[in-house]
Amino acid sequence: MPMHDQTSYMTGFGNEFATEAVAGSLPVGQNSPQRVAHGLYAEQLSGTAFTAPRGENRRSWLYRIRPAAVHGRFSLIEQSRLHNDFGGGPVPPDQMRWSPLPLPATRTDFVDGLYTMAGNGSPEAMTGVAVHLYAANASMRDRFFYNADGELLLVPQLGRLRVCTELGVLELEPQQIGVIPRGLRFRVELLDSEARGYVCENFGGLLRLPELGPIGANGLANPRDFQTPRAAFEQREGRFELVAKFQGHLWRADIGHSPLDVVAWHGNYAPYRYDLRRFNTIGSISFDHPDPSIFTVLTSPSDTHGTANMDFAIFPPRWLVAQHTFRPPWFHRNVASEFMGLVHGVYDAKAEGFAPGGASLHNCMSGHGPDAATFDKASQADLTRPDVIADTMAFMFETRAVLRPTQQALNAAHRQADYQQCWSGLRAAFQPPTTEDAT
């Protein structure tokens, strides 16, 4: 049976799941029996240290047709669009914005379509992130990929994806996200003729739900809305290619079978998807615009309490009702660095120039905020009426470390050289009181 005919999901975030595509494949009461049912092999996939605290420990046991060790020797793939070289050269403090990444003119699958924009940290140190775009027009048929450097957060903007993994099938569409754990093998099939989107490669602590604090027990992204696939497998032999991302480079090896041959598995280290339209948005119902941390969907913790390695936040449809308040996002300089993208519609802080598929980067202490047209409109708005922002889905990868743009991003033809001009219309309107006014 093809894998896509086995697509179904289990619900919950970080749950201890157990699933089998063939009845009787999961051992009862133990992980590694002397002989696994149906002639399968037992293999553990560890996403954290064995000794990580129980509440943070992530691992799954896989029962598969062949162990993951069965493949040929790896050789380096010479390519230049995907890398983790963020260490050299000065980083300009400019605000930056890019138009959408052009779609490919020749056959390009997901792996070949990856394009690194910026990053910080390193896979060696297991801290930081890399931000990539992807643009593809072909499915991965006899090719499989895994990333040993970090987990992958996929944000589709154009076109639907079917992500066939060792642990089951994720189908994603724009306004949904998918997370692929570090090390998990998968292939990406296009369900439409073209696909484009964003990828955050997280080298640091595994993504988790943010603490809710005074919000209470419910709100933001609710755990029940996350979906993890049930076991699904394929048994194919032939000439296939296994591509690995390891220490910032791509490597390839021959493999004589499909590695998506896990018949059953149990554990809490698994891929998942989430529909951003289910996010329970929190906002002010009195005055002022709260800090954007209230829009956090997932967070990767750092070694500093209260400071994330990376936060993934969204700006979804919502009502703005704050009184005597400038309702759009305010002008800001931030110790953190912000990479933004737009999946759908219009972003409420930018009247023009920020298109779906585009991106912006506001690094540490770079001033940013609404453009002149948005400021003028919001400053004169009738606050007796709510602003209903109904047609939007923007997002942000916010990192504690500076995001160092790659040379290809700095020199890209789709970089908007005149981005700073969106603030040029913000004129000085200060009128100090006269002596008569003071009296």
Curated annotation (Swiss-Prot):
Annotated homogentisate binding sites: 347, 368
GO BP field: L-phenylalanine catabolic process; tyrosine catabolic process
Protein residues bound to Fe cation: 332, 338, 368
CDD domains in alphabetical order: cupin_HGO_N
One MF term in the entry's GO annotations: homogentisate 1,2-dioxygenase activity
Record InterPro entries: HgmA_C, HgmA_N, Homogentis_dOase, Homogentis_dOase_bac, RmlC-like_jellyroll, RmlC_Cupin_sf
Catalytic site positions: 289
Enzyme class: oxidoreductase
Domain of life of the source: Bacteria
Pathway where this protein functions: Amino-acid degradation; L-phenylalanine degradation; acetoacetate and fumarate from L-phenylalanine: step 4/6
Entry keyword set: Dioxygenase, Iron, Metal-binding, Oxidoreductase, Phenylalanine catabolism, Tyrosine catabolism
GO cellular component: cytoplasm
Catalytic activity: homogentisate + O2 = 4-maleylacetoacetate + H(+)
Enzyme Commission number, as recorded: 1.13.11.5
Disulfide bond positions: none
Entry-linked Pfam families: HgmA_C, HgmA_N
Keyword Flavoprotein part of the UniProt annotation: no
Co-factor requirement: Fe cation
Task of the protein: Involved in the catabolism of homogentisate (2,5-dihydroxyphenylacetate or 2,5-OH-PhAc), a central intermediate in the degradation of phenylalanine and tyrosine. Catalyzes the oxidative ring cleavage of the aromatic ring of homogentisate to yield maleylacetoacetate.
Family assignment from sequence similarity: Belongs to the homogentisate dioxygenase family.
Assembly and binders: Hexamer; dimer of trimers.
NCBIfam families hit by this protein: hmgA
Name of this chain's protein: Homogentisate 1,2-dioxygenase
The organism of origin for this protein: Xanthomonas euvesicatoria pv. vesicatoria (strain 85-10)
